[in-house]
Amino acid sequence: MQINITDNEISWAERILLSPGKHLSDEQKAVIRCFENKDIIACPGSGKTTALVAKLLILSRKKPLKNNRGICVFTHTNVAINEIKDHALFASQNLFNYPNYFGTIQCFIDKYLAIPAYILKFNKRLRYIDNEVFNSVIERSYNSLHSAKAWFDKRREGGLEYLQRLRFNKDNFGISLKIDGREFIGIDTPTYREINCLKLRILKWGYLCYKDAYSLAFEYLREHPGVRGFISKRFAYVFIDEMQDSSTIQVELLNKIFNDNVVIQKIGDINQSIFDYDGDLECGWTINNSRTMCIAGSKRFPSSIASKVERLCVHQQTITGNGRQTEITPMIIVYNDSTVQQVLSKYGEIIIRNNLHQNDKRIFKAIGWRGKPHDRERTIPSYWNDYSKEVKIRRTEFNNLKSYLDSQSDDSIYSQGVNFYRRRLVEAFLKCLRIVGIPENGRTFTDKKLNKYILENRPNFYKDFRINLAKWCMKIHRKEEVYEEIKNFITNEFKNIFNFDVNSELLSFINSTNSEEGNEGAICSNNIYKYSSGEDEVNIEVSTIHNVKGETHTATCYLETYFRDYDIKRILDFIIGNGNNPNGKVLIKNLKMSFVGMSRPSHLLCVAIHNDNILGREEELRNSGWDINNDLVGGMAVYN
């Protein structure tokens, strides 16, 4: 189906999505106008999601599509879905209604394949598709094993952990260590038979991990091939955002779900595929060079950074800098063993020298690949003794309202979904009820009972309550102010629903301004290095590359760390511009990590390198567009 998009329609989308005077690039407009099967390669900071949202908004005005077919939009996190909805919802309410679908690949497979397959198989509904719940069921069942337990207990990595990793095979529903691997032991052995019975029993109870849901989906498609036609008939277009984060298993399933009557556009940057996909080490995106489109222009950084980042591409990619962005020559900070812990202060000095600390929206970060301390080699803690690797900690109750409203990193929400914020908000409301002594029939309220009570006693208010929860969740993640709004809700509507008086203890809980540390299952970082020079001060957050994927910083300092060798040393030829044809898993992984890390800054890129690892190559670095700061090795800074 050919769809024509006019200049006026694009101008309309620009007015909705962009600041006054801003416009979409010609490359973005070409993507918006394209309705063919395409692999769309978008460089860091290209505005690809903005282009996708603009396209969706314009499509929503052309509905209904022929034969009332819909649009399917996949992302890899609920946060990304909410960002798209947040941009588009006020402009197009019907965009998110049937026959369209917006969500993660996992949710789609669960809803349209795994759950129907389960109902057909057992004539009842599933209880949970969740790794944590599934693993807890396995743990409770472990001691009930007989001959298999002895076999598992002998394993070096621990029997329970090994058992929790076993999956239903996607091809034959056997039991294998990987979803596409061979059986973990001979199928005629007592151990295999016992584990097969256990897995099937847990499945019958209604518990699945995410990978087993995929295997159930594969089985469903094998046994009911007509499902592919039904799903393909519903959707005219499929758009997959952040395609580089798709695993080989997800891609294989998508290929089996949609037939040739569906136009599929895959959007992303294959050079940024740094996640391990829960055991699937390979990115599932195989680019078809005959049908690629590119968004090569970055709105994030200038040409001085674009040229350095382009050299790190594993897959050849053109990256054009933003000509309106201030040009600051990227800087190499050279240090030695005795000055490694002065790198962050030198970075802070360079930030202030370039007046970046005066920017309105300033974010300064120092990042590295390896955050775990090493006995002999340098990792992130080597640069700053107070660094502690971001860890997941359990905390569900706090002594003040503000602590329940803290925003979390994208990686934390990536692992848990936006439901994390909803749980925290409900926990805050339940805390209020406990403070004023409101029980239900003498028993403490729970999340489920709270919703049930409001639904039964204030049905007209229930819908508004749910909508407000969703709205507050999105605001919290975007770091927007919600405290006053939620405070007023508790002391007015919430108080009236449960008919309680606001006592002094509740007032203390609500009004306290000291946000406590700690979050339930969240990645918590207090790794803020403070640098001062006279009256000027900058806060530098120290983090891992994985934790900053997708972010934009004012300045980024890439810290050389050790993984089988020093990462900057390993890719120095590429940094200089002499690298070509990368091969070997470690080198390719290294280049992708460095590509993600060095493509974060909008203004200033620094790279910290030990003197031993660039000795004799300073001239090459300078000639290839790097300034070199030798202050920490007793030399003079060398600038182009």
Model-derived features with residue positions:
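The feature marks helicase ATPase cores and/or their adjacent C-terminal helical subdomains
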Residues: 1-640
